[in-house]
Structure formats: C-alpha cells, structure tokens
C-alpha cells in the first residue's frame, strides 16, 4: 500500500473510532438533565504541591526534569495504541462480560465482626477494589479507601460501582492510619477522605499527594508525605513507601509532581505489603530482601490490558511478585468492583487462582467484606462463578479450586528479614514522626522529624 493511501486508510480508521466514541458520549448526554451537562466537581482535581511540600518534591532523587520517574523506563500506553483505539476497545469489546451477570454476593459486614480482636493479631478485610482494612496488633490501617459510587470528578459519568460497599463508612469505626498509594480516582476518593478527616487518623501518602488532602481540609500536621524508601513510625507501626511502576494523573492539566508507591507496614509481630497499582519490575525482590518475609501481600491483579502492559500487573505477574516479595498469603485485589479494563469481569480471579496453584502459592480470595486472618486463610472457593457472565459452553481456567496449599510454597525460599528497628510504643503527633531513610544496601542510615508540610525534615 502506497504511503498516501496508507495515511488515508489510517485517517478513515481514526474518524470511525471518533464516531463510535462520540456516539456513546451523546447517548450519555441524552439521559441527563441539561443542568448536569457541565457539572464537574472541580475540587476533586485536588491541588499542586506548594511551599515546603514542593521543595521536598523537587529535592527527591526520583524527580527528574520536572516530573517523577519510574524505577525503570515506562510507557503509560503501549506504542501503536492511540487513545481513540483505546476508548473504542473499552466501550465496545466484550462489553457484556466486563460486568457481572447478577448481583455480586457481597458479605454484609457488621461492626460486631470487627469488635473482637483477631486471635492471631492480624486480620484483613477486603472492602472492594484496592480498599483493605488491616488490623495489626490493635492498630487499624485503611488502604486506598474509596466509598463513592463513581471514581470520577463527575457525578454523572465515569466508572460506577459493580457492587455496594460491604459496610457504610459511618459504621467502620475509628481508623488509626490511612494509607494512599497514588492519586488516581479509584485509589484517592475526595468524599471518603473528607469523611475520614473528621476522625483522628493520620494520613500516609507518597510525596506531593498530601497537597490534595490539604486542599480538601485535612490538617497539614496529620499528613505524612514519604519518598520511596522513607519510613515513618505511627502508633507502634512502621510504614515505608516503596517503589512501584505506575504514574499519577488527576486534574485537567498533566502534573509530574505527584509520586506513586507501594507500601510496607510493620508491627512488632507482623508485616504486610500493599502493591497499589504497579507494573512488573525487578524491584519486588529488593523489597522482599529488605522487609520480607510478609505475613500477607495485597496484590493488584485486575485492570490490566495490552494497551498499558507496563503499568498494571497481570495475574501471573502478581503471583510472581508475591513470590519475589517472600509473601506467605496473597490477597488479590483491584478487581471486581469497577469496570476499568477490557478483560472479562471474572478473568482476574480465574487467572490468579490458576497461577497460584501452578506456583504453589497460598491464596485468600474472600467475598468483598468477609474478614479473615492470614494465619488461617479461608479455602479459595470460586464464589465469583455464580454471577459471572460466562458464555454457555465456555471453559473456566480452574475446574476446581481446592483449599490453600501450605504457607511455605515448594521451591520458595523466604527472603531474609530486615533487621528490626525500635518501634514507637504510643501514637505520636504527625509533627513528631521519626523517619528512616535507608540507602540501597543498608536498612537505615538517618532519621528526622516530620514538619508542618507533612514530610520529614532532614537533619542539617
């Protein structure tokens, strides 16, 4: 095909894709009152870092040429995949299978189920998507809390919940620490943050993200901004922001001043890892060597696509990352709650179970809202199959899902634990949080105190 003809053909393709996109947007507009057409919750865009917070961002070794950089070269979108082609895929491909065919069997969590301390000292409750309540030795940590109906700056459009929240936020009870992995709408929810800010929680966030929280009314002294490999001690826990392979984007204008991260949370008896959103990179083994082994890992297994293969794990990659981290029990998350990728709704669970069985990994796949203790994980019963929109005659990836395998998978040697440092016995004010900043080959080498900008002040 000659070059002019090729360009004409491609222009025709793009025009067709644009037509499909505009058709679907037009249908959405037709169902709305006219006064809703331009209604945008502009506060949800957040705010850019300023002052001391911006100074900390600019001084990060991971901030290069005006924006944060990933641990390895990364493309948010794969080459050859135009935004219009992406939108066409998300809107048109296999649409009937991207949502459940019936109501998701959510476990209606009652406050009484959380009133008794866990026997082992560690309990996890997956509340949907990346939201997990972790109870570690009497301290309650809430990861990436999202209670809103849509993950969008709009009230009328954007990814909508596929199942209700298992527990109203008002019934959750006190939260000690809120941990945010990055500023995407499905991980950082303005309305949920504002509600949680009415309590006494301290908010741990990656560098720059605290600007959003402060814009929404969270007092600066309650915000702890951390760079990769920095740690803070809160309420007897040590929280460390660890690298991830992703990106941030929230407002109408691009900004590279917000960091993304995974998280390590340690008590005197237990260790947890939360992946946030991330693509595959070699750093999982490094994190496992420094901080593992982990009692449980919470791993992103959904919202993957050939369009963005470098910024979201596939289920198979998530299982391998769990092994590299030295995890004992893996909790798959970031699937089943919002329709964010072209894959079928149930596919992340099926592929995760298949990969875990092949690798001999202990898996816990509870219904949303069902608490469990990693010391005694529940059998991996495939509850999702009852509501999946699986075509007649289609084969499932895992015909049977047996009980979990033993905690130490065959052929897996757990990483050596990192030397423990003293943990605070009582919850300090965020302005007095001690931070630990490890070097590449050392567990830790310096400490500072948290300033009013929400981040550690390094000693002169």
Segments and roles (model prediction):
Residues 1-171, 206-274, 295-301, 351-371, ...:
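Metallo-beta-lactamase
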Residues 156-204, 292-298:
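Active-site metal-binding motif and surrounding structural segment of the metallo-beta-lactamase
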Residues 142-143, 174-183, 204-207, 272-278, ...:
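Active-site neighborhood of phospho(di)ester-bond hydrolases with catalytic His/Asp-centered motifs
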Residues 202, 217-235, 290, 305-308, ...:
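Binuclear metal-ion centers of metallo-dependent hydrolases, dominated by the metallo-beta-lactamase
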Residues 187, 211-215, 283:
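Phosphate- and divalent-cation-binding pockets in alpha/beta enzyme and binding domains
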Residues 147, 242-267, 384-407:
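Active-site-proximal loop/helix segment associated with metal-binding centers of metalloenzymes
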Residues 191, 246-325, 346-347:
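Active-site-proximal loop/helix segments of hydrolase catalytic cores
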């Amino acid at each position: 095909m000659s070059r002019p003809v090729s360009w004409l053909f491609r222009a025709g393709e793009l025009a067709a894709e644009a037509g499909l996109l505009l058709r679907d947007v037009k249908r959405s507009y037709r169902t709305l009152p006219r006064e809703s057409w331009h209604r945008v919750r502009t506060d949800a865009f957040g705010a850019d870092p300023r002052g001391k917070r911006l100074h900390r961002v600019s001084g990060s070794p991971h901030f290069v040429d005006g924006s944060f950089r990933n641990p390895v070269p990364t493309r948010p979108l794969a080459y050859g995949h135009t935004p219009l082609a992406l939108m066409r895929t998300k809107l048109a491909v296999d649409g009937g299978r991207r949502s459940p065919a019936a109501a998701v069997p959510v476990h209606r969590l009652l406050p009484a189920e959380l009133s008794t301390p866990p026997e082992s000292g560690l309990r996890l409750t997956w509340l949907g998507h990346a939201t997990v309540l972790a109870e570690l030795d009497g301290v309650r940590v809430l990861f990436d809390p999202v209670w809103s109906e849509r993950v969008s700056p709009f009230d009328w459009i954007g990814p909508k919940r596929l199942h209700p929240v298992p527990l109203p936020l008002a019934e959750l009870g006190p939260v000690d620490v809120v941990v945010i992995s990055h500023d995407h709408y499905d991980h950082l929810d303005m309305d949920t943050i504002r509600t949680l800010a009415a309590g006494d929680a301290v908010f741990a966030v990656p560098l720059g993200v605290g600007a959003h929280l402060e814009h929404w009314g969270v007092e600066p002294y309650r915000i702890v901004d951390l760079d990769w490999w920095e740690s803070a001690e809160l309420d007897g826990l040590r929280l460390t922001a660890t690298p991830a392979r992703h990106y941030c984007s929230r407002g109408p204008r691009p900004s590279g001043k917000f960091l993304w991260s995974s998280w390590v949370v340690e008590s005197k008896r237990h260790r947890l890892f939360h992946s946030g959103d991330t693509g595959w990179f070699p750093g999982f083994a490094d994190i496992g060597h420094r901080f593992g082994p982990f009692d449980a890992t919470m791993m992103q297994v959904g919202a993957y696509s050939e369009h963005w293969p470098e910024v979201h794990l596939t289920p198979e990659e998530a299982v391998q990352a769990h092994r590299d981290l030295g995890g004992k029990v893996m909790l798959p998350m970031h699937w089943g709650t919002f329709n964010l990728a072209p894959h079928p709704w149930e596919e992340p669970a099926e592929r995760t179970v298949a990969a875990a069985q092949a690798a001999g990994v202990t898996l816990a796949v509870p219904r949303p809202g069902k608490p469990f203790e990693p010391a005694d994980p529940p059998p991996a019963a495939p509850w999702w199959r009852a509501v999946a929109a699986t075509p007649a005659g289609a084969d499932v990836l895992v015909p049977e899902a047996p009980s979990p395998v033993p905690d130490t998978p065959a052929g897996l040697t757990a990483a050596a634990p990192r030397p423990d440092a003293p943990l605070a016995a009582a919850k300090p004010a965020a302005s007095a949080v001690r931070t630990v900043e490890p070097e590449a080959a050392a567990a830790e080498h310096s400490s500072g105190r948290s300033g009013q900008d929400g981040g550690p002040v390094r000693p002169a």
